[in-house]
Amino acid sequence: MLIKLEIPPGLYKNGTEYQAAGRWTDANLVRWFENTLRPIGGWQTMSSTQFNDVARGMHGYFDNSNNRRVIVGTTSNLYVYAEGVSQSNITPSGIVTGRNDAASQIGYGAQLYGEHAYGVARPDNEQYDPVTTWTIDNFGEDAVCSATTDGKIYIWENNPSAVATVLTNAPTSNQGVLVTDERFVMCLGAGGNPRKVQWSDQEAATVWTPASTNAAGSLEVASDGKIRAGIV
């Protein structure tokens, strides 16, 4: 005798496997169609062109015409994969070249002369320059990007033939950038202050000076640490 199994779609993760009796509890690379579990479609190569350096950030989205966009930031360049277009180099003019590897600041002249006694072991307090990373988000169909080595906020205005440009009036020496669902562009570690968060006016990515007529502003996190990332 065959018994028809009618397992509801979706994964149950809120309790134990015993509590999830009759439900799927774990899966990977699957989807549900008409209440049945099926594998997702196969992967496709977007481009066979390789990068010249290490990719350190990526963000994908759809533009207003439902075209796919994938922005990739590497150590020294910024690229876009646009639907129907091969890889395009949209690296901003004058961007500071980043680092593939972290670098230790222990070379000659890194410490003060005579700071430690001769023959005494030095403390392990070396300073490091971290690898370059990118934060990338989309403001509508445009992309906003920032590399840690460079610190500027760049905007790419959804044109594969044009490079990204500096976002007008935005702070510099930032640690990262993100966009909220309410369409505020936010800078992390804004202006070189490692604990400052600064945001633009709503729906106006180039308005950063607070006024009674806009919603731009900033705050400083009450901590002695440094902002490294954010999520909205």
Question: Which ranges hold each PLM region?
Answer:
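A fold-level detector for beta-propeller and closely related beta-sheet-rich head/sensor domains
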Residues: 71-72, 148-149, 168
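Tryptophan-centric aromatic hotspots in well-structured domains and transmembrane helices
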Residues: 61, 134, 154-155
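Beta-sandwich interaction modules
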Residues: 119-138
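Short, charge-rich binding segments
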Residues: 133-138, 144-146, 176-179
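Asp-box/WD-like beta-propeller blade repeats and closely related beta-sheet repeat scaffolds
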Residues: 126-129, 158-179
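N-terminal beta-propeller domains
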Residues: 1-116, 174-232
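Hydrophobic or amphipathic alpha-helical targeting/insertion segments
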Residues: 88, 140-163
